[in-house]
C-alpha cells in the first residue's frame, strides 16, 4: 500500500508546486514509484493528458518529475476562472459545466468522492503519493466542504507539512497564524513545517525557526534557500509571471517580443521556451502601459475568456497602439485566444462566456470565430508551413474559426486538417496549437521567420536539468529520509 504526504501552504505562490516537483524527482531517483496529486486546482494553465483529458499544467510538470505520463487522476478537480466570480469545472479531465463561486462552494461536497477515487487510483500504482494543497491552509472561511486542503487531508488521513514563504516577509506570523486559526483537529494533521525562499546566512534564522516551533508546536523540517534553478521551470500562477519572465536585459538581446497581460491569460507556459533564448527579450505589459513601438513582435497568447479579454484589450487602449504598430510595419502573432482576437468578428450565440454576444475583433486577419458548445481537447502533430518543420502540441479551445486568411494556414496536421491563418503580407499570423515553442526545431524555425538565430539548447533537457537541480537543492536542506517516515 502506498504512503502519502501532503504539502500545504500559508498562501498562494509560496512554492508548493516547486517543492512537490523537486521531491517527486528526488524520491523517483531513489527508485520509488512516485505520483503527484492535487485534489483541486484553480488555474487557466492546463495540459492535455494522453487520453485527451485536461489537468493543471503544474501536475503535468510534477508527473514529468516522476518520469510518468500525466493522468487525469493527478488533478481530479480543475477550476478554470472565466470571470471574477465564476469558473469552468473540469472533473477527472472532462468538462462538467460552469458555476459561480457561491454555487461551486456548495457543490464541492459532492466532488469529494471523485477526489478520493482518483487518489486511490494513484495509490494503487505507486509507492509514494505527494499531495499538493491549494492556496492557503488557513482560509477558514472556505473550510466547510473543503476538498483542497485540510478537508482532503482528514478525509484521506494524509499527514500535512505546512510551507511558509520568508521572501514575502512575516513567515513567523504566516505559520504561527495558521496554527492559531485552524481547528485543533486540523492542526493534529500537521507533522511539521518548511520555510521556503530564504536568502542570506541561515544561521541568522535559527532563532526564527525556534520561535515558529514555539508558537505553533510544530517541528521545523527545513529552511530552504532560494533556488536559482527554479527559474528554468514554468510558472504555475499568473501572479508569478513577472518574476519568471521580466528580467534584466541581456547584452545578447536582439529581438523584443511584447506580450500584453490580460485578466483571462491562459497557457502562458507557451512563453517559457522563448524566455530561455538569449537573443530574445520578453516584455510583459499590463494595463496602464503603452504598447512599445520598438517591439519586434507582439504576441497575443491564450485566454480563457477571449471576448472579455478583447474588451479589456480595448479598455487599455492597446487596440489603438496595435493598429498604429501594424501600420508602421509591425508583426503580430496570436496563439489560441489571441488568434481568435486577431479576426474581424467573434460570436458567442450560446452565451458560453457570458450573455450571448457578438463583438468586433482586432481586424488584422480576415476570419471569424463562432463559439460552440463542443470543446476541442486533443494532442496533435504535423508540420508548420511553408517550411515543413515537424511539431507536436495540443489544441485546447472552444470555437471554430474560418475566413479568407485561413486559405493560408500556419500549420498542417497529420490528421489532414489545417490550422491557423497568415495575412497576405505575412506580417500577421496565428494558430490554435499550444506547445510549439517547446519543440526545439519548431522554435528555431519560428524565430528564423523574423531573422533571429535561435540557441542550440534543448528545452526539454533544460527542464530536466532544472528538476534534477531542484531535487538536489531540497536534498541539501531537508532530511529526505526523515520526511519519508512521516508519510502514511
From Swiss-Prot:
GO MF assignments: ABC-type vitamin B12 transporter activity; catalytic activity
Gene that produces this protein: cobQ
Name by which UniProt lists this protein: Cobyric acid synthase
Pathway: Cofactor biosynthesis; adenosylcobalamin biosynthesis
Catalytic machinery residues: 336, 434
Alphabetical list of Pfam families matching this protein: CbiA, GATase_3
Entry's family note: Belongs to the CobB/CobQ family. CobQ subfamily.
Keywords, sorted A to Z: Cobalamin biosynthesis, Glutamine amidotransferase
UniProt-listed NCBIfam families: cobQ (TIGR00313), PRK00784.1 (NF001989)
Matches recorded under InterPro entries: Class_I_gatase-like, CobQ/CobB/MinD/ParA_Nub-bd_dom, CobQ_GATase1, CobQ_N, CobQ_synth, GATase_3, P-loop_NTPase
Superkingdom, natural source: Bacteria
